[in-house]
């Protein structure tokens, strides 16, 4: 299997990266191209998972190893394919997803795209015990940050814009409401 690839990012189109590795250009499916857009025509490392189906071979790509590991766990869940798993990972932060699974939070998981209550319950049932390797413990501050990002994404901002805004304006003692208000002001500039 191909764990990671290092090459020049030649193009980004329709949720796919085109990575030139030693004069061979690979098509890599990614859920959110936003992270990679800053690296066009530069050398980058993409963590990958190769999926072989009856009719195609696909490479799925991730910006970091935690996203790859979570993807590998999610595709093991009964009736959850790689496209659904990718949608889940790109819709939220890894720590937010893992925390919801560990805490058996069906409601939070159900807010992710393509996940209803039954699928959320199945994910929790099948993955709860295997989430220990992620060692995710969210502080109250982390929870506020993630909730603020989720709120901004719900309002139509991209995940990358939302993360950038929240990290720029974050103060130690801000309430969730204050964080969201300040982030909205930051984003409306």
UniProtKB/Swiss-Prot annotation:
It comes from the Bacteria. Residues 140-189 are annotated as: Domain III. InterPro entries: DNA_helicase_Holl-junc_RuvA_I, Hlx-hairpin-Hlx_DNA-bd_motif, NA-bd_OB-fold, RuvA, RuvA_2-like, RuvA_C, RuvA_C_sf. Residues 135-139 are annotated as: Flexible linker. The keyword DNA-binding applies. Disulfide bonds: none annotated. It holds the Pfam family RuvA_C. CDD domains: UBA_RuvA_C (cd14332). GO terms for cellular component: cytoplasm; Holliday junction helicase complex; Holliday junction resolvase complex. The keyword Oxidoreductase does not apply. GO terms for molecular function: ATP binding; four-way junction DNA binding; four-way junction helicase activity. Its main location: cytoplasm. Transmembrane segments: none annotated. GO terms for biological process: DNA recombination; DNA repair. Belongs to the RuvA family. The RuvA-RuvB-RuvC complex processes Holliday junction (HJ) DNA during genetic recombination and DNA repair, while the RuvA-RuvB complex plays an important role in the rescue of blocked DNA replication forks via replication fork reversal (RFR). RuvA specifically binds to HJ cruciform DNA, conferring on it an open structure. The RuvB hexamer acts as an ATP-dependent pump, pulling dsDNA into and through the RuvAB complex. HJ branch migration allows RuvC to scan DNA until it finds its consensus sequence, where it cleaves and resolves the cruciform DNA. Homotetramer. Forms an RuvA(8)-RuvB(12)-Holliday junction (HJ) complex. HJ DNA is sandwiched between 2 RuvA tetramers; dsDNA enters through RuvA and exits via RuvB. An RuvB hexamer assembles on each DNA strand where it exits the tetramer. Each RuvB hexamer is contacted by two RuvA subunits (via domain III) on 2 adjacent RuvB subunits; this complex drives branch migration. In the full resolvosome a probable DNA-RuvA(4)-RuvB(12)-RuvC(2) complex forms which resolves the HJ. This is Holliday junction branch migration complex subunit RuvA. The gene is ruvA.
């Amino acid at each position: 299997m191909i764990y990671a690839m290092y090459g020049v990012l030649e193009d980004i189109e329709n949720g796919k990266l085109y990575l030139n590795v030693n004069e061979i250009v690979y098509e890599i499916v990614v859920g959110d191209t936003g992270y990679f857009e800053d690296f066009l025509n530069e050398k980058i490392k993409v963590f990958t998972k190769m999926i072989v189906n009856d009719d195609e071979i696909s490479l799925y790509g991730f910006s970091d190893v935690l996203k790859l590991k979570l993807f590998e766990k999610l595709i093991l869940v009964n009736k959850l394919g790689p496209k659904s798993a990718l949608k889940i990972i790109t819709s939220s932060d890894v720590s937010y997803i893992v925390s919801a699974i560990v805490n058996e939070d069906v409601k939070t998981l159900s807010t992710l795209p393509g996940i209803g209550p039954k699928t959320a319950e199945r994910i929790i049932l099948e993955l709860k015990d295997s989430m220990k390797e992620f060692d995710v413990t969210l502080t109250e501050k982390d929870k506020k940050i993630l909730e603020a990002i989720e709120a901004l994404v719900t309002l139509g901002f991209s995940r990358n814009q939302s993360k950038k805004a929240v990290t720029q304006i974050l103060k130690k003692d801000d309430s969730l409401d204050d964080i969201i208000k300040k982030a909205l002001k930051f984003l409306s500039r």
